[in-house]
């Protein structure tokens, strides 16, 4: 009623709460997100919406969704492509890690996901600084990820090639 933007957020865990294949999981995630878009539009025509879905695989040992897995970025990039085709903004997560402390794993996972989501063209990236499969937030992780975000933005800008610049 107040025209608040709605950010759809189903969470599909391939092989646990959704199809085991990434293609099947993305199809289910997009379908669930689109259902939410329809409900939002039925409730308030013209309501701003953003498409999104989590696609982390299930860590069977801990019973938690892995936010550091490559499948998370694969799924987010695929749903972003669908959203862009439909002219909808999209969201996802990056700068998060399965690691419990700031270490090589946390840096590698954060950097990979930040660059992957930047290249996929997501409009809104959240959960920066999340650690331990989203069970904690680390200020150190947030600061490090902020630096990586700056590097990724610079990388994605590229550079100009022209007679003047040569």
What is each PLM-predicted segment?
Residues 90, 99-166:
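C-terminal catalytic subdomain
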Residues 1-123:
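Helix-rich catalytic cores of soluble enzyme domains
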């Amino acid at each position: 009623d107040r025209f608040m933007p709605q950010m759809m957020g189903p969470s599909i865990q391939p092989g646990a709460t959704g199809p085991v294949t990434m293609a099947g999981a993305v199809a289910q995630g997009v379908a669930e997100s689109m259902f939410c878009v329809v409900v939002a539009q039925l409730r308030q025509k013209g309501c701003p919406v953003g498409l999104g879905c989590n696609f982390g695989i299930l860590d069977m040992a801990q019973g938690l969704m892995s936010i550091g897995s490559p499948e998370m970025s694969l799924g987010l990039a695929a749903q972003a492509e669908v959203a862009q085709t439909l002219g909808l903004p999209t969201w996802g997560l990056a700068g998060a890690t399965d690691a419990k402390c700031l270490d090589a794993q946390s840096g590698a996972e954060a950097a990979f996901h930040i660059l992957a989501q930047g290249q996929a063209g997501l409009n809104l990236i959240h959960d920066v600084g999340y650690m331990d499969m989203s069970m904690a937030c680390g200020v150190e992780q947030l600061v490090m990820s902020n630096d990586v975000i700056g590097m990724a933005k610079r990388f994605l800008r590229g550079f100009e090639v022209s007679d003047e610049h040569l």
